[in-house]
Amino acid sequence: GKGLRTAKDTKRGQKMDGITIRTAVPADLDAVVQVEAACFPAAEAADRKSLKERLDVFPQSFLVAEDGNRIIGFINGAVTNERTIGDEMFEDTSLHEPQGAYQSIFGLDVIEEYRHRGVASRLMKAMIERARSQGRRGLILTCKDRLIGYYETFGYVNMGISKSVHGGAVWYDMILEF
């Protein structure tokens, strides 16, 4: 009908230009490692072992963006009762608290040729939606100063310079509370 969205249209809307967002599975490891290496300098990139542990320990908070069968981006993070991310959380998956109040974002990666097409936004929105549906209080992340404004568009608030010295960079603590 005119101006009425059918169920088929809505479903296609989630796909948008052939790109889908889904929960990661262990078989995604190789592709995820490649995306991480392409998106972050070596000092900041999570290594294969860390990414494998994250896939194993918190698959429910590890989402991938796929174009056809190609993984082009992902978002992941542990769940915690802390309101900020400590550097130890990046390395130690035992700090994941499945019933925790806050969904952290350890990484939001999109390969270069797919940037500026809304893929990162869709990954973030999917993670926010998942955190909300799981009854979390909100989400937390750390970012560099140039990305503060970007994350504010999702409702995150800047809490100032983080204690994190991950990769030798200056990070800012951001929080989104429901």
Protein language model features and the residues they cover:
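Short, low-complexity, charge-dense intrinsically disordered segments
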Residues: 7-16, 128
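C-terminal "cap" of GNAT-fold acetyltransferases
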Residues: 137, 144-145, 164-178
